[in-house]
């Protein structure tokens, strides 16, 4: 009865405050859009797409083995108009292959086409991975209220495609298409530091076919880089990665925020252990969402560098939790990430304020801690126990709503979630 009472109270509370938080989300989305337009006008010359575009130009003109040549890259960036500062290209070489066709239409047009295609891909992934038990309009409004999405759009960042791949790949795992899910998830390797723990989580969770798909694409990309970059290009790329990062690149990492030391190592070790525990429990429960979410959160805490647009993957973690996790916890996480994403948005704190950094770190630690403790404390019990605690009215209406809004395969997803909660 206690569970039933909590559910009744939660549903009553959500229905009472729904107009308020819908209004807040709409206002936040509009404000983000206004600030985004201001950034495009004032800081267009500083976007990250320039680096992809310049790298593609260098590869086409001088050979792909030269795309990490500092002098050639600097010259290519300086030739773009409007001119802006140069930053080292840290993204793996396939990003330049992807952008290369867009060099045919010129830099300005290429930027807008790239952003439009990226947002279209994300929109398709959002629709595919959307929660079936919430309004799609509300879900998309929630996404529009998240600052990292708008900042990534301004930057022309590959992070948007990474987010799309993570959402679509997760949903494929939930529907038992593991190999294809692993292939799609591997697209996140455009920014490897965002998914450091994902292969380990797939391994521990027993998702071997997904890991095979992930590793296959990674191997093909690796061979492609070896063939096109040659030893000199590989050495130049490794040197770029090993060069001490500017303060702006590392300021938003756990190590930088806490100043290094034993505390950082302890938190990072705990993050790895928590991700492993969650993945092991997800293996027994046959659910994919916990392992993907915990891997993303743990990767953030381990990352050697982090940029404002990278917070988009934490928004992805919250979106997956909202779609597949426990209802109450999912709503709270979604509300928390909206709060963190908006008032301290990277659109308003381009260099990363201490408040923004600490807010994200605390969010990730609390979120991962919740999943880890949950996996540790849950004991095996029949899944019917939880179902019997639901009031008949809630259970039947929720079941009808779920079946009417989602495809048949989501019934298995819901069952997996139930097993994870009960297992």
Model-predicted segments: where are they?
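Residue-level detector of alpha-helical transmembrane segments in integral membrane proteins
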Residues: 12, 85, 141, 185, ...
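Primarily membrane-embedded glycan-assembly and transfer machineries that use lipid-linked glycans
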Residues: 2-180, 202-327, 344-346, 356, ...
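Transmembrane helices and adjacent periplasmic/lumenal helix-loop junctions
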Residues: 185-201, 303-310
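Membrane-embedded alpha-helical segments of transport systems
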Residues: 190-193, 220-224, 330, 334
